[in-house]
Swiss-Prot record:
One of the Pfam families matching this protein, by short name: Mur_ligase_C
Residue pairs linked by disulfide bridges in the UniProt entry: none
Family to which this protein belongs: Belongs to the MurCDEF family.
Annotated InterPro entries: Mur-like_cat_sf (IPR036565), Mur_ligase_C (IPR004101), Mur_ligase_C_dom_sf (IPR036615), Mur_ligase_cen (IPR013221), MurD (IPR005762)
MF (Gene Ontology): ATP binding; UDP-N-acetylmuramoylalanine-D-glutamate ligase activity
Name of the protein: UDP-N-acetylmuramoylalanine--D-glutamate ligase
GO biological process, one term: regulation of cell shape
Job description of the protein: Cell wall formation. Catalyzes the addition of glutamate to the nucleotide precursor UDP-N-acetylmuramoyl-L-alanine (UMA).
Species of the source: Streptococcus agalactiae serotype III (strain NEM316)
Amino acid sequence: MKTITTFENKKVLVLGLARSGEAAARLLAKLGAIVTVNDGKPFDENPTAQSLLEEGIKVVCGSHPLELLDEDFCYMIKNPGIPYNNPMVKKALEKQIPVLTEVELAYLVSESQLIGITGSNGKTTTTTMIAEVLNAGGQRGLLAGNIGFPASEVVQAADDKDILVMELSSFQLMGVKEFRPHIAVITNLMPTHLDYHGSFEDYVAAKWNIQNQMSSSDFLVLNFNQGISKELAKTTKATIVPFSTTEKVDGAYVQDKQLFYKGENIMLVDDIGVPGSHNVENALATIAVAKLAGISNQVIRETLSNFGGVKHRLQSLGKVHGISFYNDSKSTNILATQKALSGFDNTKVILIAGGLDRGNEFDELIPDITGLKHMVVLGESASRVKRAAQKAGVTYSDALDVRDAVHKAYEVAQQGDVILLSPANASWDMYKNFEVRGDEFIDTFESLRGE
């Protein structure tokens, strides 16, 4: 970690805790800042705030009082989940207090090379694939960012021999100014998080911030399956490295069921360790980054062949009596479920779907669910999902929760079948988050395996 004096003896407000806010507060204190943390959760229910207070950091909890900004703060570090139209953020901007993101703070003190990965779907899997390939090739890839390891925590233990492999959300990228990866990946761009950004155009603009400071000596890996990526590619100073499953490009591509990089045969599509067309795209992006990093074809091939997926993202759990179980709880939109289904023979799949009702109809899903062996439907959106199943001619059962859904699916399944949790919906109608939903699926699988 570099020693910088930017924040020394400066008053800094950290707005919002969670893991990234906690890490930012501790890093700022280490850099000599006079830190105040403001979090909406009451102090007596906030062990993180209590811990920070014991370390000498001022905490204001239970609300976000605008008068707090009457103090002469020099900077605000904003939790990525807090939108820019939040009254505290708006007042800070009106007072011309610089509002930084936690990843920008981490970047300012980092002395490690940075690989940044963003996109609508596939971020976590691609980030994990890249880190595993780098490490298998003898380099030191450290996971950071939106993948569960706050960047401002990871950088404190990293040096110039490490490579930060950082997953970045649109929330984290919105507002970055100096942030500059040496290699950036945008897996794909789909309409999502529009409630936060307001429009698809603003969402894309936030993602595109990843390349703002890049130059021709940096590399931008883009999905040329998408026309929008081809158009955006014309507007960057970075060197473009495309990937595509539909055409031969000057980068990573598929030809005759094999993965290539600039004419070099890397591996067979069927040898990728996780199923689904989306994982072919993730593997291509990983290959592009790995080749730029100097990793050998053999290491790339072996790592991607042995890759078992990421928890809750088309995670293979194993088999019970010849029935395969896949946990894709991270599938919170239709596109993710479409991509998950693309890796299987529909006639052998029992799909568990449904969740938070956002008013979406699921007609887009009809071609993808046609031919399924059965569906088990749950959650607020159940009636809408069932309408799609009816139109697709697929039989279905109702379930009370994920545990009940697994048992209903298991009753229908036979040897050689697949039970797939890929809800196409957020989890918040029934579960705290998609991780809790997925954990219930895993627990039920383990119970069945133990019977």
